[in-house]
């Protein structure tokens, strides 16, 4: 049973907050948290991320970035990352969690590019890829629950 999902990206201000919000919306009985490997701790979500999510009726303006910690990793039943490098880094730092770390795009074999400091269209493209990943994971998570 998956009770806690940890979503990870680099700064925890763009991709992981968007994925966290979409997963929370789709899985109301599951605790979904997010963090960054090199988080801009305490920073709000990127204004462009807030904007694209608002266009989809989801408010992430209250999000504050947090650093990935061993405690967060150990609490998570499932850890979803944005790319293969993040997956490898978490697996090397936390070998006991190797079987719990997957890319959000694992099912369709894709990574989600970082839109940080790019045009709004990059955020829209990232959100589209995140949604594809969420759509692939949600039925599997529900089936385990």
From Swiss-Prot:
One annotated GO molecular function is: protein tyrosine phosphatase activity
Q: In which pathway does it act?
A: Glycan metabolism; exopolysaccharide biosynthesis
- Catalytic reaction annotation: O-phospho-L-tyrosyl-[protein] + H2O = L-tyrosyl-[protein] + phosphate
Could you name the domain of life of the organism this protein comes from?
Bacteria
Q: Does the keyword Translocase apply?
A: no
Annotated EC: 3.1.3.48
Q: Does the keyword Hydrolase apply?
A: yes
- Known SUPFAM superfamilies for this protein? Phosphotyrosine protein phosphatases I
Q: Which GO terms describe its biological process?
A: lipopolysaccharide biosynthetic process
EC category name? hydrolase
List keywords of the entry alphabetically.
Hydrolase, Lipopolysaccharide biosynthesis, Plasmid, Protein phosphatase
Xref: Pfam families: LMWPc (PF01451)
| Active site per database record | 9, 15, 114
For this chain, the family text in UniProt reads: Belongs to the low molecular weight phosphotyrosine protein phosphatase family.
Please give the function described in this protein's UniProt entry: May be involved in assembly or function of the EPS I polymerization/export complex and/or the EpsB ATPase. Alternatively it may function in the removal of the terminal phosphate from C55-isoprenyl pyrophosphate in order to recycle the C55-isoprenyl phosphate lipid carrier used in the synthesis of polysaccharide repeat units.
| PANTHER family hit by this protein | LOW MOLECULAR WEIGHT PROTEIN TYROSINE PHOSPHATASE, LOW MOLECULAR WEIGHT PROTEIN-TYROSINE-PHOSPHATASE ETP-RELATED
What's the name of the protein?
Answer: Probable low molecular weight protein-tyrosine-phosphatase EpsP
- Identify the taxonomic lineage of the organism of origin: Bacteria, Pseudomonadati, Pseudomonadota, Betaproteobacteria, Burkholderiales
The UniProt gene name for this protein comes to epsP
């Amino acid at each position: 049973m998956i009770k806690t999902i940890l979503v990870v990206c680099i700064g925890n201000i763009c991709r992981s907050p968007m994925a966290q919000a979409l997963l929370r919306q789709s899985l109301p009985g599951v605790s979904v948290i997010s963090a960054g490997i090199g988080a801009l701790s305490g920073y709000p979500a990127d204004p462009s991320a807030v904007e694209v999510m608002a266009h989809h009726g989801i408010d992430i303006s209250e999000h504050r970035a947090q650093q990935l910690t061993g405690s967060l990793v150990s609490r998570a039943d499932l850890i979803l990352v944005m790319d293969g490098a993040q997956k490898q880094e978490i697996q090397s730092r936390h070998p006991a969690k190797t079987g719990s770390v997957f890319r959000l795009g694992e099912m369709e074999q894709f990574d989600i590019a970082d839109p940080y400091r790019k045009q709004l269209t990059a955020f829209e493209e990232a959100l589209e890829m995140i949604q594809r990943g969420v759509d692939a994971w949600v039925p599997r998570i529900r089936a385990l629950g």
